[in-house]
Amino acid sequence: MTMGSEFQFRDKIPVVVLGATGSVGQKFVELLVHHPWFDLVAVAASDRSSGKCYGEAVNWLMPTPLPESIAKMTVQKCQPDVPGMIAFSALDASVAGEIETQFAQAGYLVVSNSGSHRMDPDVPLLVPEVNAQHLALIRTQPFPKGKIITNPNCSVVGLTLSLKPLCPSKVCRALVRKRKCS
């Protein structure tokens, strides 16, 4: 059975967003708040924001309104005692490595947008439409129950999605030029 849009879980999976007050964290919140599979049960951020209501701690930048139920949530510290089975991490790379590892050691599945674990040989660098088989790497991770999965940076995601259809044609070289906006 494939998990298409018709698939329904009996119970939603409880999730937490780490780094929830930043722009990437806000995007995670926006995507998860009405998701059919996930129940956003906690938001976590820096010590500066923890203890505050999310609505007070965040400068909401998303085009959709912040749901009142989420705005009333108390921002938790980024420690692995927050509720949830999956941690969607939008943490800055300067702190993500240690915190994400702590969450994985505590049994969470960590889905990271940070670059901290991108070069770890046992962490899948996943673009599901291109390399879903890369998930097999999680079997080699040292955590008894938790795991870490990450994505490549935004330029690489677009590039791999564009180049994947060319693989059967045996294109051997692609010249890519990336320019950073400022």
Name each model-derived stretch.
Residues 1-182:
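N-terminal Rossmann-like NAD(P) cofactor-binding subdomain of oxidoreductases
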